[in-house]
Amino acid sequence: MVSQALRLLCLLLGLQGCLAAGGVAEASGGETRDMPWKPGPHRVFITQEEAHGVLHRRRRANAFLEELRPGSLERECKEEQCSFEEAREIFKDLERTKLFWISYSDGDQCASSPCQNGGSCKDQLQSYICFCLPAFEGRNCETYKDDQLICVNENGGCEQYCSDHTGTKRSCRCHEGYSLLADGVSCTPTVEYPCGKIPILENRNASKPQGRIVGGKVCPKGECPWQXLLXVNGAQLCGGTLINTIWVASAAHCFDKIKNWRNLIAVLGEHDLSEHDGDEQSRRVAQVIIPSTYIPGTTNHDIALLRLHQPVVLTDHVVPLCLPERAFSERTLAFVRFSLVSGWGQLLDRGATALELMVLNVPRLMTQDCLQQSRKVGDSPNITEYMFCAGYSDGSKDSCKGDSGGPHATHYRGTWYLTGIVSWGQGCASVGHFGVYTRVSQYIEWLQKLMRSEPRPGVLLRAPFP
């Protein structure tokens, strides 16, 4: 008769030889040697109840004493290797068991103290998480947040101008007519009509908002308050941009064929050319200054600065556009996707000019894309570092003849800045072509120096550049 111990051993070890031996030993008992599963007087397989009695974990020495005591972490898992179930018996809580098991099974990932600058560490399965103090960030709390406050990183958080300083945190500054608030980043106007603000919109009842009309639509009266109209002998010539009470920026090519300079005027506050509403201010142009490097009939260095005979009076309909600092323009404004261009140019290529001031929202292109496009057209002038492209290549929208000299205005954190001057293009809204604008940032120092200078004799002046 096969002992119960032998049958259990055979079942656990799965040894056919063992079972076979049992079969041989009991052959006389009537079981078939090759079919031990068949029932007989001495069966090999045990009952379910007997099997459950076998599948208990092996007891340690003195197990009968251990079972009388509650689970001990020191005894169960530190003196000897324990299982997840044994750990659960100790902690009596699944979540606490999981937290323990992460560290117990793959080691404590926080043991090397990876979190820097006072950060606290939480162990994870083959990983860890650092909880940083408020002034730090990063995977290991290695980055001091103030080190990220540099001007190339989102303008250092400044509303207007940003300056980096070696060894110290960046500082914010404001344009003339604004002052820095106590937060060190925001700017508030200190004059009634600061540059780059639109009084009509600032004063409008917030309960009745009227968004700016863009996409080649009419600019509502007063919403392009820096727009200037240049005229000679009573005829429309070009557009311009008021940058302070006595100076207007425009395009140099507008003056290539001027003969009677005495009849050149600039009109501010204009909206509808077919009517006079009392908000217009006309001023004779006393002097036109162009770069010495500009060659008439060409496209490079296409910028002009006009000195008015008398300053204009700032009103809700006459406000200058801010002339930004060069670093701010190149580092921040140049990466604003959309800007506004405005003027009374032709509504269609070779079509009639607009009577009401028009405005268009145009996307700025990367210089490389602009260069590639210009190379596809044999007779297209070269795109230089003094220009940039903006607009739509599908021929749907563009600035046009008559818009020349007008502003490319960029909005940033509540203030508008002059970033470009309408210069030239292949036709108007021609498929495959973009509008080309004078890159104002290249001329900031040149413009500022001229505006600080004393008047010089002569109407047309060629000033050294750079």
Curated annotation (Swiss-Prot):
GO MF annotation terms: calcium ion binding; serine-type endopeptidase activity
Propeptide: 21-60
Post-translational modification: The vitamin K-dependent, enzymatic carboxylation of some glutamate residues allows the modified protein to bind calcium. The iron and 2-oxoglutarate dependent 3-hydroxylation of aspartate and asparagine is (R) stereospecific within EGF domains.
Location of the Peptidase S1 domain: 213-452
Signal peptide bounds: 1-20
Residues carrying the site annotation Cleavage: 212-213
Enzyme class name: hydrolase
Major location (coarse): secreted
Record key words, sorted: Blood coagulation, Calcium, Cleavage on pair of basic residues, Disulfide bond, EGF-like domain, Gamma-carboxyglutamic acid, Glycoprotein, Hemostasis, Hydrolase, Hydroxylation, Protease, Repeat, Secreted, Serine protease, Signal, Zymogen
In-chain residues carrying the UniProt-annotated modification (3R)-3-hydroxyaspartate: 123
Residues that coordinate or bind substrate: 398
Pfam family for this entry, one: Trypsin
Reaction equations catalysed: Selective cleavage of Arg-|-Ile bond in factor X to form factor Xa
GO cellular component terms, A-Z: extracellular space; Golgi lumen
Cell compartment(s), UniProt: Secreted
Quaternary data: Heterodimer of a light chain and a heavy chain linked by a disulfide bond.
Known function: Initiates the extrinsic pathway of blood coagulation. Serine protease that circulates in the blood in a zymogen form. Factor VII is converted to factor VIIa by factor Xa, factor XIIa, factor IXa, or thrombin by minor proteolysis. In the presence of tissue factor and calcium ions, factor VIIa then converts factor X to factor Xa by limited proteolysis. Factor VIIa also converts factor IX to factor IXa in the presence of tissue factor and calcium.
PANTHER family reported for this sequence: COAGULATION FACTOR, COAGULATION FACTOR VII
Official protein name in the record: Coagulation factor VII
Organism: Pan paniscus (Pygmy chimpanzee)
Gene name of this polypeptide: F7
